[in-house]
């Protein structure tokens, strides 16, 4: 496997909370996929702070993923097309759907994700990998001399 791209993102949890409050909850429905939304509602029902932290980490993971694949938030990368879920062990993993899944499969791209949060911030890091050579990837690192 070769690294296709990397992405990282950090978000202030209070900003996510403010947007969620301002939109009456619609922000979560816009950003989260169906499985993420179920987890969000369950966590938020137990603890408002944990629900908001979950939303913030998933928002951050989508931003980091969009950077790792080089698209930013442009089609076929959409908020709901990528979900970050957790294995029973707690390990996070990403699941793509629809046209994004097709786009990734055509390029042989898989990804690894990690997320973390504290009271004020949520952060994520994504490594996108491929078994196929990237069409515009350099073959070597160039070095300039003074």
UniProtKB/Swiss-Prot annotation:
Location of this chain's protein in the cell: Cytoplasm
Name of the protein in its database record: Holo-[acyl-carrier-protein] synthase
Principal subcellular localisation of the protein: cytoplasm
Single GO BP term: fatty acid biosynthetic process
Pfam family, one: ACPS
Task performed by this protein: Transfers the 4'-phosphopantetheine moiety from coenzyme A to a Ser of acyl-carrier-protein.
Main EC class the enzyme belongs to: transferase
Phylogenetic classification of the source organism: Bacteria, Pseudomonadati, Pseudomonadota, Betaproteobacteria, Burkholderiales
């Amino acid at each position: 496997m070769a690294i296709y791209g990397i992405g990282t993102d950090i978000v202030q949890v209070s900003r996510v909370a403010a947007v969620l409050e301002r939109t009456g909850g619609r922000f979560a429905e816009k950003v989260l996929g169906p499985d993420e939304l179920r987890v969000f509602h369950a966590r938020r029902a137990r603890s408002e702070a944990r629900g908001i932290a979950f939303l913030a980490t998933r928002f951050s993971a989508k931003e980091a993923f969009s950077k790792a694949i080089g698209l930013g938030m442009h089609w076929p990368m959409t908020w709901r097309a990528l979900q970050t879920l957790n294995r029973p062990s707690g390990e996070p993993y990403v699941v793509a759907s629809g046209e994004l899944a097709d786009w990734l499969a055509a390029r042989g791209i898989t990804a690894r994700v990690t997320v973390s949060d504290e009271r004020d911030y949520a952060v994520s890091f994504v490594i996108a990998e491929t078994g196929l050579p990237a069409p515009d990837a350099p073959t070597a690192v160039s070095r300039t001399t003074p």
